[in-house]
Regions:
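NAD(P)H-binding glycine-rich loop region in Rossmannoid oxidoreductase-like domains
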Residues: 45-94, 98, 116-121
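Conserved Rossmann-fold NAD(P)-dependent oxidoreductase catalytic core, especially the SDR/UDP-sugar
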Residues: 93-136, 154
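Conserved beta-loop-beta element that borders a ligand/cofactor-binding pocket
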Residues: 143-168
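A conserved pocket-lining segment of Rossmann-fold NAD(P)-dependent short-chain dehydrogenase/reductase
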Residues: 178-200
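Terminal hydrophobic/aromatic helix or amphipathic segment near a protein terminus
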Residues: 239-287
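Substrate-binding strand-loop-helix patch
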Residues: 194-203, 224-245, 258-262
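N-terminal Rossmann NAD(P)H-binding glycine-rich loop of SDR-like oxidoreductase domains
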Residues: 3-28
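Glycine/proline-rich active-site loop of Rossmann-fold NAD(P)-dependent oxidoreductases
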Residues: 163-178, 213-225
């Protein structure tokens, strides 16, 4: 019997890669919830694609369909504005509650690593001082992990996401600004600072999601939380890789410290939100994470240079 998977956010950057991966690597039937099908660059004339015209705001209309699904992948989110809580918390809660626990094998929810500490525990600061988006993702996860479907739930927490090309796949938020950043490399090369992070390309996210859907992930203690990203790299490593790629030599560098940033803020009367100040103090966004290799896969974009070569 053909397996059925319900996908939200299929027209976004990560969504495009997931749809493409599932079409190429499984024989499943995909049900895509799309507000604007014209944004989907994948050939949706395939007999394995069913387009459902709508969005999370009217998810109740699709309750009977969702109850029949073997799998669910929810990548859709509201990034800010008056509907942030409605979409990211209430409607996602409704979506996952419509799944039949006797039918659904696995449900994947996309959150953000920004709400976690390095041990994958929820950070109270995300709820207390986070942006509307951050706070809503924090609240949603708490609710989803208390639903009956929690035993089948895998929450993935992408780190810094690259991907897209502006043609058959839309850019991620980070990749959309990459060309602009590269213009400033002649100046950035003179700077250094303490900090570290993970990154991952949307292609590799899609690899991981497909693997998780097909094979599952047993950590012995559901629901599962997985931070996905390549091994950590320092900010200074990133600067060095970008400079090497663009052939800008590094001679000497100015140390950018929190004290220096605060001085610049004071001199120019720059305002910074409480959440941004918290992130500035954190500096190291490093987690207990998994890579494609941890699941027996091979990352297509293991290094920053691989990503830059696609720009």
């Amino acid at each position: 019997m053909t397996q059925r998977v319900f996908i939200t956010g299929g027209s976004g950057c990560v969504g495009h890669y997931i749809v493409e991966s599932l079409l190429h690597n499984t024989d499943w039937h995909l049900y895509l919830l799309l507000r604007n099908p014209q944004k989907l660059k994948v050939n949706y004339s395939s007999d394995r694609l069913t387009i459902l015209r709508g969005d999370l705001q009217n998810i109740e209309q699709f309750r009977s369909i969702i109850a029949q699904m073997d799998y669910l992948v929810s990548t859709a989110a509201c990034w800010g504005g008056e509907n942030t809580y409605l979409i990211n918390v209430e409607k996602n809660h409704a979506l996952f509650s419509y799944l039949d626990t006797q039918v659904c094998k696995r449900a994947i929810y996309f959150s953000t690593a920004s709400i976690l500490d390095q041990h994958k525990n929820l950070m109270p600061e995300a709820e207390a001082i986070g942006t509307d988006y951050i706070r809503s993702k924090y609240l949603c996860l708490k609710e989803l992990e208390s639903l009956p479907i929690a035993q089948k739930l895998i929450t993935v927490f992408p780190t810094i996401v690259f991907g897209g090309n502006g043609r058959d796949k839309p850019f991620s938020f980070i990749s959309a600004g990459l060309q602009e950043v590269l213009r400033y490399v002649p100046y950035i090369r003179w700077l250094k600072t303490e900090g570290s992070f993970h990154f991952i390309h949307a292609f590799d996210i899609a690899q991981i999601v497909t693997k998780l859907l097909v094979d599952g992930y047993d950590n012995g203690n559901p629901p599962v939380r997985l931070v996905i990203g390549m091994p950590k790299m320092s900010v200074n490593q990133a600067i060095a890789e970008v400079c090497a790629f663009t052939k800008h030599p590094i001679w000497w560098q100015i140390e950018v410290t929190p004290a220096l940033i605060n001085l610049v803020r004071w001199l120019f009367r720059l305002q910074m939100a409480e959440w941004d100040q918290f992130c500035l103090r954190q500096r190291h966004f490093v987690y207990d994470h998994i890579t494609p290799e941890d699941l027996g896969l091979t990352a297509k974009y293991p290094r920053l240079a691989n990503i830059l070569s696609d720009v």
